[in-house]
Amino acid sequence: MTTTEYVHSLAKKARAAAADLRRRTSAEKDARLLELADALEKEKGALDAANAADVAAAREAGLSPALVDRLTLTPARFAAMVEGVRTVAALPDPVGEVVWTRTRPSGITIEKTREPFGVVAVVFESRPNVLVDTAALCVKTGNAVVLRGGKEAARSNAALAAVARRILGDAVQFVAIPGHEAVAELVRAVGLVDVAIPRGGERLIRAMCEAALIPVLKHYKGV
């Protein structure tokens, strides 16, 4: 299977899951998120072991202390990650919320409502907790997500993604192959991925924008 075929297969699964999410009630989505929080706590030992392996490899490779720190899922960060999922579950469902209503002179009423994008691709660096944060936010808002993390956190991301996929199903897809080509294919997947969101340094963001054929929600210098 080529990189293009692999990425497209993930995106197609995500698109089918996004259609299913549109049929889910707020209570159903929230229940899944609470189940995810519980599952993360239950799997903490295995998740900690995966993260410890990433941290050890990063130190052995001579990566900067700042990067190693961002990579590390400390007990406090793990607890905050789990609590973050529960916090998202407790938020009001934004899907279908009426932002404004206007009545035209003709008598026609126009409403602006909040609706899901569909499939969101999120590419992030270093911090493995971003995977869980993003998955929770996307499912809450009715979006499926295709996630790609940094190579430094490969073991942590794979372990967290496995838990998220077990609970949230195909609404969460994880790009497990290395290399920049997979990211380029994600942002060129017209008709499969609706929007891409980079979370990382300026170099990553510019590379994604240069390759993109789909909309990219971006910043260059921070927000």
Each language-model region and where it sits:
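Conserved NAD(P)+-binding/catalytic subdomain of aldehyde/semialdehyde dehydrogenases
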Residues: 119, 175-223
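A glycine-rich helix N-cap at a beta->alpha junction
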Residues: 166-175
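Short alpha-helical
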Residues: 46, 129, 155, 181, ...
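Short, surface-exposed connector motifs at secondary-structure boundaries
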Residues: 141-146, 169-170, 186-193
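N-terminal Rossmann-like NAD(P)+-binding subdomain of aldehyde/semialdehyde dehydrogenases
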Residues: 1-109, 137
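Conserved small-residue-rich beta-alpha loop and adjacent elements
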Residues: 90, 94-165, 213-218, 223
